[in-house]
Amino acid sequence: MRAMKWLIGLVAAYAVFVLVFEGVYLGLMQPSFEKAECQGFTQAQRRARGDCGIPMIQLSIESTNQTRQTTMLARLEMDDGVYVSAHHWTRGWYHAALAAGEVDGEIDGQLRRYAVEPVVGGEFQRVADRMPLSLPVRFLMGFPPERQILRLDELP
């Protein structure tokens, strides 16, 4: 019985930790994991330097009732496209972006308009392979459901 109480306590503590990490730290504080001195670097320059952190995009989505939702996301630039991944429990931004069809994205202080396309099949696998989620990262996120990926195509 005592072991069961400890197990329940550990599971409850882990659940609270995940809620605080996902909801407060990532959801409310929305930190950038990109080093400021690397902003404006190309993907090749980032790789050569090696210590630039995670490239980020600030996505701004306008809903049908004219309200704006802004969220900070990790980005991957590949094959002339910008990719973002919904790999946390909280992914309301993903559904809002799909519903809107177009979003604004700010990268390195440059605001651009993008068309939104869900990624599936071989393209999904190529992007997922370039944005791996290690076990420690999945642990911090509470082992979320399978990721969903969007491709952002820049509009003229």
Which role does the model predict for each range below?
Residues 1-2:
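N-terminal Lys/Arg-rich, disordered targeting/topogenic segments
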Residues 5-23:
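Hydrophobic membrane-insertion alpha-helices, especially the h-region
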Residues 6, 10, 36, 52, ...:
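Residue-level signal for well-ordered alpha-helical segments
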Residues 52-88, 103, 114-115:
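Short beta-strand segments
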